[in-house]
Structure formats: C-alpha cells, structure tokens
C-alpha cells in the first residue's frame, strides 16, 4: 500500500496518450521516455531506487544491446552500496551509458555522472556538481567501530582511485579535492574531467 506522500507524487506524474493500431494507450511520462532509452536518476540514491535503475538498464540492454542509454541525473547523493550497484551495472552492460547532469549531481550522484561512457558525459549549463569523501557513522563496541572505520577508509580509497581513472586527475589531487565538500560549476566539472562537455542546446 502506498503512503500518502508517495500516492500524491504519483498522481502528479503526467500521462502521455498515444494512438496505436489497437487504439489509445497511455503511459506515465517516465515509462514513455524509457521507450526512448532515457532513464531518470532523481533524488536520494538508496536501495529501492538503485534496484529500479538497474532493472531499467538491464531491460534496455535486452531490447537493443548496441544502442546508447541516456541517464539523466539530479541527485544529492546517498548510499555508496546502492550507488555502486548502479555503477557496476553501467560498466557491465553492452550499451554505452551517456550521463547528463540536470540540476545537481552531488556525492554518489557525481560519481555516477563521471562513470558514464567516455566522451558521453555532460552537464547542462547551470547544473552543479559536488565531490567529497564518503560519510559514515557507527555506534557500538570499540572493536566494531574500528572495523567500520577501516571499511570506510577502504571505500574512500577505492572511490578516489575510480574517480582518478574517470577524470584523469592524479590520485593525490583527488584525495585533496575530496577531503571536504567541493562544489563545481558545469564548466569547472568539465575542466576537472568529471564530464566531457557542457550542453546548452541539443544536437
């Protein structure tokens, strides 16, 4: 059963009506855009959202393994493990995944933006990008806290290395620049190597 905010949100999603040989057919706008190989990654990156994105990526691969997929990102970030599920699927499937930042791509959102196919990562002109180190908090016995601290440090090093690979920046620059919240304009993100270009007009 849907909770009240979710049902209100779903009621606000526009519907598109199409004429087919079998009569009229209606889609919500996101399902219609999925037919055009467009996926929206919007809001907090968490497990449920990640599963939906992964399912859409796999579905579009099964439909046409040689056609690009377009992933539009407007996200403040979120769970590292959920984000890595999306990232690994982007790298795993055959189609190139072109990423486009609309609004913001922060934290894990920025990581997924940078993880798009080389030459096919873009920002719109007034979008913002933010990179930083992973956040973590844990309560419990001292030995368990130490274990979790080591895990977070390991994740931090792995994410930094992957960002270095995608941006072409040296590892020491990535480590310095992710030490605190680091905000960039679209042009700065392109200069840094997080994206390949800033798009003001289609085509």
From Swiss-Prot:
Oligomeric form and interacting partners: Fourteen ClpP subunits assemble into 2 heptameric rings which stack back to back to give a disk-like structure with a central cavity, resembling the structure of eukaryotic proteasomes.
Biological classification of the source: Bacteria, Pseudomonadati, Pseudomonadota, Gammaproteobacteria, Alteromonadales
Gene coding for it: clpP
GO cellular component: a single term: endopeptidase Clp complex
GO biological process, any: protein quality control for misfolded or incompletely synthesized proteins
Catalytic activity as recorded in UniProt: Hydrolysis of proteins to small peptides in the presence of ATP and magnesium. alpha-casein is the usual test substrate. In the absence of ATP, only oligopeptides shorter than five residues are hydrolyzed (such as succinyl-Leu-Tyr-|-NHMec, and Leu-Tyr-Leu-|-Tyr-Trp, in which cleavage of the -Tyr-|-Leu- and -Tyr-|-Trp bonds also occurs)
Highest taxon of the lineage: Bacteria
HAMAP family tied to this protein: ClpP (MF_00444)
Cited InterPro entries: ClpP, ClpP/crotonase-like_dom_sf, ClpP/TepA, ClpP_His_AS, ClpP_Ser_AS
Keywords: Cytoplasm, Hydrolase, Protease, Serine protease
PANTHER family named among the record's database cross-references: ATP-DEPENDENT CLP PROTEASE PROTEOLYTIC SUBUNIT
Similarity remark: Belongs to the peptidase S14 family.
Keyword Hydrolase recorded: yes
Enzyme Commission designation: 3.4.21.92
Catalytic center residues: 107 (nucleophile), 132
Protein name: ATP-dependent Clp protease proteolytic subunit
The species this protein was found in: Shewanella sediminis (strain HAW-EB3)
Pfam families: CLP_protease
Class of the enzyme per the UniProt entry, highest EC level: hydrolase
Role noted for this protein: Cleaves peptides in various proteins in a process that requires ATP hydrolysis. Has a chymotrypsin-like activity. Plays a major role in the degradation of misfolded proteins.
Subcellular localization, as worded in the UniProt entry: Cytoplasm
Any GO molecular function: ATP-dependent peptidase activity
Disulfide bonds: none
């Amino acid at each position: 059963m849907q909770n009240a905010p979710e049902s209100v949100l779903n009621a606000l999603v526009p519907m598109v009506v199409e004429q087919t040989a079998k009569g009229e057919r209606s889609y919500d706008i996101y399902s219609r855009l999925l037919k055009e190989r467009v996926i929206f990654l919007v809001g907090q990156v968490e497990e449920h959202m990640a599963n939906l994105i992964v399912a859409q990526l796999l579905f579009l691969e099964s439909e046409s393994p040689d056609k690009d997929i377009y992933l539009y990102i407007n996200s403040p970030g979120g769970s590292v493990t959920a984000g890595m599920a999306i990232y690994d699927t982007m790298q795993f499937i055959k189609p190139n995944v072109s990423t486009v930042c609309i609004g913001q791509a922060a934290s894990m959102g920025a990581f997924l933006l940078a993880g798009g196919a080389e030459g096919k990562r873009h920002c719109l002109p007034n979008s913002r990008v933010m990179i930083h180190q992973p956040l973590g908090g844990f309560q419990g016995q001292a030995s368990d806290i130490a274990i979790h601290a080591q895990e977070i440090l390991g994740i931090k090093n792995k994410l930094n290395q992957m960002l270095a690979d995608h941006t072409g920046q040296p590892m020491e620059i990535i480590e310095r620049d992710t030490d605190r919240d680091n905000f960039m304009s679209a042009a700065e993100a392109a200069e840094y190597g997080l994206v390949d270009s800033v798009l003001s007009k289609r085509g």
